[in-house]
From Swiss-Prot:
Family matches, as PANTHER family: GLUTAMATE-1-SEMIALDEHYDE 2,1-AMINOMUTASE, GLUTAMATE-1-SEMIALDEHYDE 2,1-AMINOMUTASE 1, CHLOROPLASTIC-RELATED
GO molecular function: glutamate-1-semialdehyde 2,1-aminomutase activity; pyridoxal phosphate binding; transaminase activity
Superkingdom of the source species: Bacteria
Principal localisation: cytoplasm
Xref: InterPro entries: 4pyrrol_synth_GluAld_NH2Trfase, Aminotrans_3, Aminotrans_3_PPA_site, PyrdxlP-dep_Trfase, PyrdxlP-dep_Trfase_major, PyrdxlP-dep_Trfase_small
Protein name: Glutamate-1-semialdehyde 2,1-aminomutase
Amino acid sequence: MKKSQELMTRAKRVIPGGVNSPVRAFNAVGGCPRFIKSASGAYIQDVEGNSYIDYIGSWGPMILGHSNPKILQAVSKVMIKGLSFGAATELEVEMAELITRLVPSVEMVRMVNSGTEAVMSALRLARGYTKREKVIKFAGCYHGHSDSMLVKAGSGALVNGVPDSAGVTIGVAKDTLVAEYNDIDSVNLLFEQNKNEIAAVILEPVAANMGVVLPKDGFLEKVRQLCSQNGALLIFDEVITGFRLAAGGAQEYFGVTADLVTYGKIIGGGMPVGAYGGRREIMECISPIGPVYQAGTLSGNPLAMAAGITMLTELSENPQIYEHINRLGTKLGDGLRKITSNTVNSVGSLISMFMTENEVIDIRSAMASDTGEYSRLFNHLLNKGIYIAPAQFEAMFISNAHTDEDIEKTLSAIEESLNEMRKK
C-alpha cells in the first residue's frame, strides 16, 4: 500500500483529514484508505493495481455497474457541446418528464446538485407550504449535512433537537424533533406535544445509514396517517431507495405515497445531482412562481441529465435488472445467514450484516453491534479482494454487473474471514 500511503500523506497536508468525505478516511476500521484509480462493472482497482469486488458502488448510484458503456456514451456525446450553460436545456425537461412518469406521486420535480441540497430545499418548501416551522426526523436516519438535519435524539424522542455537529446553532436545531424509527408512539407523542406546529415528517423509508433497517409492517402507513390527520407533509428521503427498490422507489415497493420525495446521486448514474418533487400544488410554491426561494447555477446541468436519462431509461425498460439484483441480494443475504449467527438485514439489493445476534430495528439496537469485530472483518475482506463499507453502519449495494460467481466468492471470503477471526 506504499502508493496509497504516500497519497494519504500528501492529502493530509492540503485536505482536512486527507479526504473530502469522512467515511473515506477509514477511521472506523483502521488502516490506510485505498486510493481508487478506475472501476468497471462490479470491480474497482486501486493505485497499486489491486482489484476488488465492490459493494459500495459510490454509495448506491452504480446500480448498472461502474463505467456502464451506455452512460459513458451519453455523457461523452453531450459534453462536447458544452459542460454548463447557466440556462434551460431540453435535457432537463426530458429528465423531469421521465421522473414524473416513473413516480406517479411526483407531479412536478426540481433538479438540484446533491441529496443534501434536495433535502434542504424540500424542508424549506414544506415549511413554506404549511406555514409551520417544526420538522420530525428519526434517530439514525441520515438526510445529508444541512444544519437542521444534523441533530441527535438527546434523551430520546421527548426533547427538541440537539446539535450533532460543531457549528450548528441551537436556534437552527430547536425546530427539529427526533422520533424513534419503527416506534409510531414516539411520532404520535411529538404530534400531540406540538399541535399545529409540525410542517413535515422526513424519513428514509428503509433506513440505510444506521445499517439497513427495514420498517416494521404498518409503520410507514401509520406515519402517513398521522401526517394526514395533523396537516403535516410526509417526505420520503429516497436518496438510497429511489429507483433501487423498484422503478418507482420505496413508494411503489411499500405502496405508501409521500407528499414530497428527495433523490440524490442515483438519478445521475454517479454524476453530482439531486432532485425533489411531489404534488403540483406543493411544488408550485417554489420560485419563480411561488414564495419559496431555491436556485442553483449547475442545477439540471447537461452532463448529469444525460447520464440520468440514460440510466433511468435502462431501469424502466428492463425489469430483468431488478429481478437480477434482487435475486443476488437474496442469495447474499441467505448465504450470510447460513454462515453466521450475526443479524443480517436485507431488502432487494440492499444488505447489512450487523456484528450482533440481536434483532436490529432502530438506532439503539444497531449501536449494540461490535464495531471492533466489524473492523477486523473489513480488513480481512479487503485483503481477500472484497470491498465493503469502511463502517459498520452503512449498506452493501449490489449492481446489475455483479454475478453469481461474485456472490459466491464473497460468501466464501466472509466465511474464511470469520473462521480466521475466531482463531485469534
